[in-house]
């Protein structure tokens, strides 16, 4: 897995999710950017950007890969928060992540498409791209498509 983590770098647009923060649609256009920190292939700056009715917002953290999962730690005032997440699918065009329940968030799934990839029907594109068995039928049915 460490060898393929270079594919993670770049900006990704959340297209499908069951995470309440995005599913409520009060926060729009969620995007996550991963940038490798120094020469460490297992540590990334994680920047989440989104829009509310009145302004753009940003959440910054550091992701550190450890064996089979990432450990996210917030930056600044969010430094006290941490969460764990894992990659289910990582290609040049699609990223599917599963995040564990944390102190302030429920467990869930995000399905992302790389920022520069044009997709007419994100749901169809993603469902056709997923390997059988990556997500359970009930997990797919719970997704909200943004």
Model-based region annotation:
Residues 1-146:
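A beta-rich soluble binding module of mature secreted/lumenal proteins
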């Amino acid at each position: 897995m460490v060898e393929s983590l270079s594919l993670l770098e770049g900006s990704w647009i959340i297209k499908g999710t069951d995470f309440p923060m995005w599913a409520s649609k009060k926060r729009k256009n969620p995007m996550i950017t991963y940038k490798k920190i120094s020469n460490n292939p297992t540590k990334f700056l994680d920047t989440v950007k989104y829009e509310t009715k009145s302004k753009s917002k940003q959440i910054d953290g550091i992701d550190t890969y450890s064996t089979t999962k990432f450990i996210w730690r917030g930056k600044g005032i969010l430094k006290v928060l941490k969460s764990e997440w894992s990659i289910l699918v990582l290609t040049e065009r699609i990223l599917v992540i599963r995040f564990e329940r944390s102190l302030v968030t429920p467990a869930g799934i995000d399905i992302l498409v790389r920022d520069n990839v044009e997709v007419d029907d994100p749901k169809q594109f993603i469902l056709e791209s997923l390997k059988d068995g990556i997500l359970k039928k009930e997990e797919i049915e719970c997704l909200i498509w943004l």
